[in-house]
Amino acid sequence: MKNISVFCGAHEGNNPRYAEDAKKIGEILAAKGINVVFGGGNVGLMKIVSDAALDNGVDAIGIGLESLHNLELVNPRLKNQIITKTLLDRKDEFMKRSDAFIVLPGGVGSLDELAELMANNQLGLINKPVGLLNTEGYYDHLLAWMRKAVEEDFITEANFNDLIVSSSCEDLINLIIENERPDNDDWTKRLGL
């Protein structure tokens, strides 16, 4: 794997573990020689994960919105920035430039990105591992909702199980790497279609 997108909050949250885990993710990816693709921001968990990657010798590729770029909210340390006009264009760039995805604690934007990734994998528009870092149970309620959606037959068991979930940064990254998919992987079989 060459590039992994990390989606996370533009804020640090009120639990110091979120920032600690964001830093660990950047450090672990760097130790494995994997570049970080992220939202380009110079704030919150985005700044922490990108700085950790840059401090440890890999590239951080920022994919930001023109509106935020104009407000000078972009990490000034970035050598590689892609600026998009819309959120849809931004998510498309993430999907094109990444071999896998990690979602850390975050808000509505992180939830939107997670849902888009799961839907794109389900439809076969992408075929890439998606990991969810469940720091101190942050995503427990979301996972419970997903399980309920599986029970009610709105999400397939296979699509739910395709999401890689861990509360450990190291374990999550290792599971994502183990689940790297060849270009010719038949996603329909993996999802039970």
Model region roles, listed by residue range:
Residues 1-97, 136-170, 181-193:
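A cross-family phosphate/adenosyl-ligand binding-site feature
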Residues 176:
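Hydrophobic "lid"/C-terminal helical patch
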Residues 89-124, 131, 182-190:
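Active-site/ligand-binding-proximal alpha/beta "capping" segment
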Residues 54, 121-128, 154-155:
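Arginine/glycine-rich "motif VI" loop of SF2 helicases in the C-terminal RecA-like domain
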Residues 40, 64, 84-85, 104-106, ...:
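Short beta->alpha connector loops at strand-helix junctions that form conserved
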